[in-house]
Amino acid sequence: MNRLFGKSKPKVPPSTLTDCISNVDSRSESIDKKISRLDAELVKYKDQMKKMREGPSKNMVKQKALRVLKQKRMYEQQRDNLNQQSFNMEQTNYAIQSLKDTKTTVDAMKVGAKEMKKAYKQVKIDQIEDLQDQLEDMMENANEIQEALSRSYGTPEIDEDDLEAELDALGDELLLDDDTSYLDEAASAPAIPEGVPNDSKNKDGVLVDEFGLPQIPAT
């Protein structure tokens, strides 16, 4: 069948704006190179004309320089046109890419909105409120347990004012306890005489009572 009707040629994909921009920029660079060569020729003819006297030879060189200059102007015009085309295509390409980016962003936002709707459907406000109530009840129970465990047994309530008054009085008592002057007074007091008043001794030096009988020492 291919021999009778021939084989169909593969379809060539259409060129994109990026390909067109690259092609135009390449042509513009090629023209720039041609302009550079023409500039070099103009410099050469200019130097020749400076060294030549007026006459047919100089006029001939001048005509060559004018032709080169005319070509240069034409190339410059072509280059400017290509640069403008490239700029316009770049602006168009930028606008297209911006629209694509915008569409991608909108599509992503739509997907996000759908996901959020699904997530909201799975979340029940009533369940959240019930859970909060349960947590609150458990915290209250925990506090009651802690209060029960820390309860004191048989400890009377103490007034803070009474404690402060006792503390102030305790300070005065401590100051009195620290005073040791009573010890000095006791040391300087006269000694207690031994024996009983009006006691006397016999000739042997033994204490006798008022009847002259020896006294029995206290045990």
Swiss-Prot record:
Q: Mind telling me which InterPro entries this protein's record contains? A: Snf7_fam (IPR005024)
Which cysteines in this chain are paired by disulphide bridges?
A: none
Identify the keywords attached in UniProt to this record, alphabetized: Coiled coil, Cytoplasm, Endosome, Membrane, Protein transport, Transport
Major place of residence: cytoplasm
Q: Which residues form a coiled coil?
A: 28-153
Q: Disordered: where is this region?
A: 1-20
Query: Which top-rank group of organisms is this from?
Result: Eukaryota
Membrane topology listed for this record: Peripheral membrane protein
One Pfam family named in its UniProt record: Snf7
Tell me what this protein is called.
Answer: Charged multivesicular body protein 5
Q: Which organism is it from?
A: Xenopus tropicalis (Western clawed frog)
Instruction: Provide the gene name from the record.
Output: chmp5
